[in-house]
Regions:
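A short macromolecule-binding patch
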Residues: 47
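Major-groove DNA-recognition helix of helix-turn-helix-type DNA-binding domains
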Residues: 20-44
Length: 64
């Protein structure tokens, strides 16, 4: 099944930080390092909710 762009949920850096229980700066570092994909819209970043899920899944796999 192909997911349409209109269904994707995008979060701000602050929302991602709150979800991951880290600082905004940590989220910016993850984006800059290429560990967390993000789209730049104007001067701010947006992160797809699916990309956060994939990031967490990868981290749990590495830890286990």
């Amino acid at each position: 099944m192909v997911r349409q762009h209109s269904q994707a949920r995008f979060l701000t850096v602050a929302e991602v930080a709150d979800l991951l229980r880290v600082s905004n700066m940590t989220v910016y570092r993850l984006i800059k390092a290429g560990e967390l994909p993000a789209a730049r819209i104007g001067k701010s970043f947006r992160v797809r909710e699916d990309d956060i899920d994939a990031y967490l899944e990868e981290r749990f796999t590495q830890a286990g």
